[in-house]
């Protein structure tokens, strides 16, 4: 018995040099759409992270296609899970007034998409 409810494909993109807050803002637009609508939306969003998320979702589509069903189309699949978690932080310092060092935290994130 073949149950399509449990067939999923997942992709994790790690250590992206974009802040988690910026990526979550884009993922909030994309969740619960069909893949065709989500990819179309990501093409026209003017944010830096939309290209990375576009590639991650497209990769999860091809993983699903290769592993489960070769004849599946973009309209039949939906994004079930899309999240961004914080990654390791690169810590730098910048000289500040009166001989102090001012910390600079370059944030990274991990993106997980599941269809």
UniProtKB/Swiss-Prot annotation:
PROSITE patterns: RIBOSOMAL_L22 (PS00464)
Pfam families to which the protein is assigned, alphabetical: Ribosomal_L22 (PF00237)
Highest taxon of the lineage: Eukaryota
Keyword set, alphabetical order: Plastid, Ribonucleoprotein, Ribosomal protein, RNA-binding, rRNA-binding
Main subcellular localisation: plastid
Compartment(s) of residence: Plastid
Molecular function, one GO term: structural constituent of ribosome
SUPFAM superfamilies (UniProt xref): Ribosomal protein L22
GO biological process: translation
GO cellular component: large ribosomal subunit; plastid
CDD domains documented for this protein: Ribosomal_L22
PANTHER family given in the database record: CHLOROPLAST 50S RIBOSOMAL PROTEIN L22-RELATED, LARGE RIBOSOMAL SUBUNIT PROTEIN UL22M
NCBIfam families linked: rplV_bact
Alphabetized HAMAP family for the sequence: Ribosomal_uL22_B (MF_01331_B)
Subunit structure: Part of the 50S ribosomal subunit.
Function summary: This protein binds specifically to 23S rRNA.
Family classification: Belongs to the universal ribosomal protein uL22 family.
Protein name per UniProt: Large ribosomal subunit protein uL22c
Organism in which the protein naturally occurs: Euglena longa
